[in-house]
Amino acid sequence: MNLLSFDIEEWYIEYLCTRNNDKYKEYQRYLDTILDKLDICGLKATFFCVGEMGKFFPEVVRQIQERGHEIGCHSNKHTWLNKMTPDECKDDTRYAVDNLEQCIGKKVKS
C-alpha cells in the first residue's frame, strides 16, 4: 500500500490552457527529481494522472509506471464534478481509466 501520492497534471493543464508545451522540459526536470528522490529513499508512491495525459503525454505516465510507482486516475480532463451529471462523471472516469490502462498496459486500481 502506498501512503504517498502526487497529482501529476501540469503538462496537460498547460496544453489545455495554451495549446503549447513550453514548460515541458521544466516539468520533466521536476518529475525526474521527484522520482530520483523516491528511489534514493526506497519509496513508492501513487501518481494521480488525468486520463488525457495517457493520450497526449504517454511517455510521462509510462516513465512513472516503469520506475515502479502506481498510476492512479484523477478524472479525464479535470472537469469540476459539480459541472457534470452522474452519468457524465461515470463516463469521464471510464474514459480516463481506459486512456491510462492503454498507456501503461495494466489495470489502474486507484
Listing of model-derived features with the role each one plays in the protein:
Residues 1-110:
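Catalytic alpha-helical scaffold of carbohydrate-active enzymes acting on polysaccharides/glycoconjugates
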